[in-house]
Amino acid sequence: MPPLIPGELIPEPGTLELNSNRPTLTLRVANSGDRPIQVGSHFHFFETNTALHFDRDAARGHRLDIPAGTAIRFEPGDERDVRLVALAGHCKVFGFNGLVNGPLD
């Protein structure tokens, strides 16, 4: 058996599919600001920086569909499609920019 390395992750062989069978949607997002904006994997996308222009109502209750601990950076003037995944669990959102602070429904 090889030596153990603290913090090492040893995944099962094969391919892992993130957020399988979870509802997703794709939105066009544009950074109208003069500074880069970075959004993390678990940030409630509805509550992102107001310099990001997209259909906020559609994004309510969603986060980026990217691996945990990663982020997407939007440079000034950048415009791209992003895939969002619905939040899971009790669907209560607290913090972020304080726009919900309770249940999503």
Swiss-Prot record:
GO terms for molecular function: urease activity. Pathway: Nitrogen metabolism; urea degradation; CO(2) and NH(3) from urea (urease route): step 1/1. Keywords: Cytoplasm, Hydrolase. GO terms for biological process: urea catabolic process. InterPro entries: Urease_beta-like, Urease_betasu_sf, Urease_subunit. It catalyses: urea + 2 H2O + H(+) = hydrogencarbonate + 2 NH4(+). Its EC number is 3.5.1.5. It is found in: Cytoplasm. It comes from the Bacteria. NCBIfam families: PRK13203.1, urease_beta. Heterotrimer of UreA (gamma), UreB (beta) and UreC (alpha) subunits. Three heterotrimers associate to form the active enzyme. PANTHER family: UREASE. Belongs to the urease beta subunit family. This is Urease subunit beta. The lineage of its organism: Bacteria, Bacillati, Cyanobacteriota, Cyanophyceae, Synechococcales.
